[in-house]
Amino acid sequence: MNILIIGNGGREHALAWKAAQSPLADKIFVAPGNAGTALEQKVENVNISATDVPALVKFAQDNHIGLTIVGPEAPLVIGVVDAFRAAGLNIFGPTQAAAQLEGSKAFTKDFLARHKIPTAEYQNFTEVEPALAYLREKGAPIVVKADGLAAGKGVIVAMTLQEAEDAVRDMLSGNAFGEAGSRVVIEEFLDGEEASFIVMVDGKNVEPMATSQDHKRVGEKDTGLNTGGMGAYSPAPVVTPEIHARVMREVIYPTVNGMAAEGNVYTGFLYAGLMIMPNGQPKVIEFNCRFGDPETQPIMLRLESDLVELCLKACDGKLDEVKSQWNPKASLGIVLAAEGYPGDYRKGDEISGLPQSAVENEKVFLAGVEAKAGKLVTNGGRVLCVTALGESVFEAQQKALKLAEQVQWKGRFYRRDIGYRAVAREQ
């Protein structure tokens, strides 16, 4: 069977790498892909933008694509799944209406309230003055979010009232995030431990993927600006078996059932960004309608099941017939970023020191990398993710750090403390 993966990041490299291991897969096409996907066995890049829906549909029809997996959020929010289904094509992902869970933070907060799913207290605003009045009433620390998609950067965790007021003015009067910022959500600051809880959904049945923990801040010890994610590890020890059961019972099933009840049957990856409170209660920070990046990279390193089979079963509404199998080891991925990220960053620097052959229990997934004149050069903010398995999170971290040191280019940087919470638990 031919398979199409939509997207061009490290997440898509990991999905293509895993899909290529399936005995069901003859050929994997990635649109548009990157320099990493181009190097994988059985994988070929296709020069079509992830948001050029008509061209993607035509390609899938012309190349007998039996399954399409959507990586990023943008194509989902513009209805790529609806278009593929209308053409009678098999695609794993939520419809445009169901993807509002990620596309609109206000929709999500209102949905959670309707279905009594635990989350932070919040209010939506479109005007500056009422928003500022609410901030002054609540005080800091407080969280200000741009409604809509802002590539993971439209969230300000304000530790002072001044910071919060600046963010509101920026997003509403200055509209710093274009259209996405014309409405803001202001919500209470939750002081717990974050976890990424990703599941596969076929409309009614749910198959949990491995848990993970992402590191959003650019600096060590979680300081500095928010990014798309600087590293992740799996599993997340904060999600104990008891908390896992609570998340399924209090968050995941009510969400899947609630979406279906409202006429937006949910199929695809569903990623709940959770805050686990000190008393063990999970609260929803956000939903994403896709696999996380960089969480996908360490999670795929641990997945022992056939990803293609799982997705096909989900497309057929038969997820209850399969069970995902996981390597019991821990995995950890560290993002190597370009100088200046998450602001304006350098591009076009040659990368050296990449592993020349496959090493068991280790993998470098490429993201913002392009091939130019036979060399690999940087062309994104998050350039690649070095990923390793270990008997403990600490061992996986040390192996990943060793790998990170070998990969070089001008001005590259990375966090050396990815996984620090789990490592502290292990000591």
Predicted features and spans:
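Internal nucleotide-binding/catalytic subdomain
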Residues: 154, 158-296
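Generic C-terminus detector
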Residues: 369-373, 378-427
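Solvent-exposed alpha-helices and their adjacent loops that cap or buttress functional pockets
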Residues: 21-23, 38-39, 92, 114-116, ...
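A conserved helix-loop-beta module that forms one wall/lid of the active-site cleft
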Residues: 92-154
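Short acidic-hydrophobic, aromatic-tinged amphipathic segments that line or gate anion-handling sites
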Residues: 45-51, 123-127, 158
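Active-site "cap" helix and flanking loop/linker of ATP-utilizing ligase/carboxylase catalytic domains
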Residues: 248-270, 288-359, 371-372
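ATP-binding N-terminal substructure of ATP-dependent carboxylate-amine bond-forming enzymes
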Residues: 1-97
